[in-house]
């Protein structure tokens, strides 16, 4: 099963994984974010809908994806290109859109909140 992992991680961890990859250690597909806010900004409810519509469907046109989620083609076009730029979706040689994974795993997010006395 081909899984992509979305994670919030520090730059040092990304560098360590890159070094491990250069040494030949398998890393799996990962998309890393510097902050939880960046992850949440990318993975909106509407974009999750697009991924669900594309999962297992094979390559589709943006128009067909828009039809499947009952949304405006222009809005879907923008979301698709955002997901393409992030590496969540891919474009085939003939310009169709595909979700190239079987699943998405989102690593647990731990957020430290500093409380300040008023």
Please place each PLM-identified region on the residue numbering:
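Short alpha-helical segments that sit at the start of domains
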Residues: 21-49
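A short acidic, leucine-rich amphipathic alpha-helix
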Residues: 64-68
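General nucleic-acid-binding
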Residues: 1-19
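Short amphipathic alpha-helical interaction segments
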Residues: 71-84
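Short amphipathic alpha-helical interface segments
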Residues: 45-59
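Short, cationic-aromatic polyanion-contact patches
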Residues: 40-44, 61, 93-118
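A short, conserved structural fragment
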Residues: 85-94
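N-terminus-biased detector of the onset of the functional/mature region
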Residues: 5, 32, 59-60
